[in-house]
Amino acid sequence: MVNDTISDMLTRIRNANMAKNDLVLIPFTHINLEICQILLKEGFIQSFKTLTLDVSKYSKLNAQKNLNIVVKLKYLGRQKNSCITNLLRISKPGNRIYAKHKIPDMLGGLGIIIVSTSAGIMTDREAREQKIGGELLCSVW
């Protein structure tokens, strides 16, 4: 069992990018789903969809369904240059990082910071426009 699902998601995407895989399977949580929506809106991934795997065929103990998110990564050109250069976890379970409404730019506006606010999970630009702060989850560039 994974304690930090956001770090697990970022690591899976980072590893799939380095291996130049087209698809990556991520465990379903609502936070992971919202982060995928932001990455799609900002153009870092091509698409994503939720997938239900029926585990009852393989396990006689429990008839349970396993929810996952399948992310299709985005590459440019013949050499498959990734749209995602790096993914960094900012706020960790042992060290939470919060910011007021004056969130700094990421690489002069080239990257984004994903922020968890009282109005939901959003990018740093949206949080600055709405003048609300929150927990800095991760940065993507």
Curated annotation (Swiss-Prot):
Keywords, sorted A to Z: Chloroplast, Plastid, Ribonucleoprotein, Ribosomal protein, RNA-binding, rRNA-binding
InterPro entries: Ribosomal_uS8, Ribosomal_uS8_CS, Ribosomal_uS8_sf
Pfam family for this entry, one: Ribosomal_S8
TM spans (from-to): none
GO MF terms held by the record: rRNA binding; structural constituent of ribosome
A biological-process GO annotation: translation
Binding partners and assembly: Part of the 30S ribosomal subunit.
PANTHER family referenced in this protein's UniProt entry, alphabetically: 40S RIBOSOMAL PROTEIN S15A
Full protein name: Small ribosomal subunit protein uS8c
Gene that produces this protein: rps8
